[in-house]
């Protein structure tokens, strides 16, 4: 198991570049849906590293890695995902997350989510995400210094898409993007919010302090009769 790092991820230098900064997180992503995959359609995914960039922020040194995933079916392109990964220094012990103001918008629909270890573990398994901060509480708290298990940013994005779909059942999403702003943990509830204006949706998630955790945007079209 020498190819597995202490955080659960594969040792860097396999596909992702070797980065010595200890913390890894998903900073955001962008999806373009050219056409839906059909039942029984064969598909393949090709992943490439688009960019690696070093920056300095309030929390210290940052390394941003942009990965492109292209999913192609039997009859051409289906989904393109741009995955934004950030590596950062470990924060000082006892450091509290910075509060971020949510959008100055009136939500048309909201939902409260109570995260728990079962939800986080199942999402890790479904997305092949081995990062221990999502399911190993002693590791998350003692080694990485978090107050509890960390809620996946992509899980929050998925829940926001689900909220959009439930409130707009005839919408077919064309593009979806999200940006992680602050952390969420399994120690408290968080709230999903969203609204639609024309063929675009603004979505966001806030923690119990009403601090912004994740923001997202989607564009969509109405379903056709064949869909």
Model-derived regions: residue spans:
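Hot-dog-fold acyl-thioester-processing enzymes
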Residues: 1-28, 92, 103-168
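Short secondary-structure boundary micro-motifs
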Residues: 13-20, 35, 53-55, 96-97, ...
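HotDog/MaoC-like acyl-thioester-processing domains
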Residues: 26-115, 184-187, 193-227
